[in-house]
């Protein structure tokens, strides 16, 4: 049986930021692809290849700023794509916007066992360590501004945003599915 994965895509156009596609399953990151100065055709091509390999059941796109429009229009009839505007409304009334919500979902997943290889995905780990939230004047969780995270890690947290996007509206990572292979891997790691 093929395990279907979920993807998150954070788009960039020019500058120093990357377009990042993060592929995950229910319990870990599977692959991260960072594209620098990629045009829509290249991003679509890379995405199609990843989908052939991982069989996405859903993909969440950063629609903030409209950089996803060409990608979305080209692929919306072929794939299960969901646009997420970071400044948009949160699905959780305790979070001030969609960006806070997706990071809150990611944090809950990590607390429940979602694994991030901190060596292989050091940039994601560093960005997560630099991300915090506060309670705003309306009593809701609010992430620190992205500029503060950039100042700490020295670049935009593109791959981390893509990973967080993959948790939008998702509850699958809240209940970690431990396959026999993962169980054996954990046993081998713990009892070396």
Model regions and ranges:
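Conserved helicase C-terminal RecA-like lobe
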Residues: 146-148
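Residue-level detector of short, conserved catalytic/binding motifs and their immediate flanks
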Residues: 19, 57, 160
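Conserved helicase/translocase motor-coupling segment
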Residues: 1-49, 157
């Amino acid at each position: 049986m093929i395990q279907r994965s979920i993807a998150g895509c954070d788009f960039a156009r020019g500058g120093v930021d990357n377009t990042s596609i993060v592929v995950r399953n229910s319990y870990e990151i599977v692959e991260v692809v960072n594209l620098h100065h990629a045009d829509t055709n290249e991003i679509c091509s890379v995405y199609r290849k990843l989908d052939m390999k991982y069989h996405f059941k859903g993909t969440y796109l950063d629609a903030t700023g409209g950089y996803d429009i060409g990608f979305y229009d080209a692929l919306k009839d072929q794939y299960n794509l969901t646009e997420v505007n970071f400044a948009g409304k949160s699905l959780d009334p305790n979070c001030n916007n969609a960006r806070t919500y997706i990071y809150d979902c990611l944090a809950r997943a990590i607390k429940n066992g979602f694994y991030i290889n901190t060596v292989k995905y050091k940039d994601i780990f560093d960005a997560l360590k630099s991300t915090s939230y506060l309670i705003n004047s309306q009593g809701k969780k609010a992430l620190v501004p992205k500029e503060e995270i950039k100042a700490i890690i020295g670049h935009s947290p593109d791959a981390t945003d893509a990973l967080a996007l993959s948790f939008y509206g998702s509850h699958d990572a809240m209940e970690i599915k431990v396959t026999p292979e993962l169980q054996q891997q954990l046993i081998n790691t713990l009892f070396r």
